[in-house]
A protein has these predicted regions:
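Hydrophobic anchor residue at the start of the ABC signature
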Residues: 53
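A short, surface-exposed alpha-helical micro-motif characterized by mixed small hydrophobic
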Residues: 105-107
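Conserved ABC ATPase "signature" region
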Residues: 20-35
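Conserved beta-strand-loop-alpha-helix hinge in the C-terminal portion
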Residues: 119-139
Length: 140
């Protein structure tokens, strides 16, 4: 959900006051610099998605929930989101990624919790056997 009058304000809203990262660096990282002063609601679905992800990333929370983070993104930006998720995990962040995208699971996740009807059906590490389970689940 987007709350402010501009893309830059959306990022600033989530940033910690003592964060030394420039909000413009974050916009550049997410390929949003050209939309800096635009109202978030004037953006395409994929652009809005990237603004929301950028805001989550700069919030500096220990646990970040991503609900369908690649929804509405083109392939280039899907790969970039995957790279950013891995980088966040490598920095010690705990990420909960809710997705129906098997490529994102395989590229970005280390553990799978398979849910059905609000119940955990199965959970496993994304090792060789886990990867086979994911591919079988998505029938790939």
């Amino acid at each position: 959900q987007l709350f402010t009058e501009s893309v830059i304000d959306e990022v600033l809203l989530s940033m910690e006051k003592d964060d030394e990262t420039s909000p413009d660096e974050i916009l550049e990282l997410f390929d949003l610099s050209q939309y800096r002063d635009r109202h978030p609601l004037s953006l395409s679905g994929g652009q809005k998605q990237r603004v929301a992800i950028a805001s989550a990333v700069v919030s500096n929370r220990e646990i970040i929930v991503f609900d369908e983070p690649t929804s509405g993104l083109d392939f280039k930006h899907m790969r970039e989101v995957s790279r950013i998720l891995k980088a966040l995990a490598n920095r010690g962040k705990t990420l909960l990624v809710i997705t129906h995208d098997p490529e994102l699971v395989m590229a970005s996740c280390s553990y799978v919790i398979h849910m059905e009807k609000g119940q955990i059906k199965e959970n496993y590490p994304l090792d060789v056997n886990g990867a086979k389970k994911v591919l079988n689940f998505f029938r790939i």
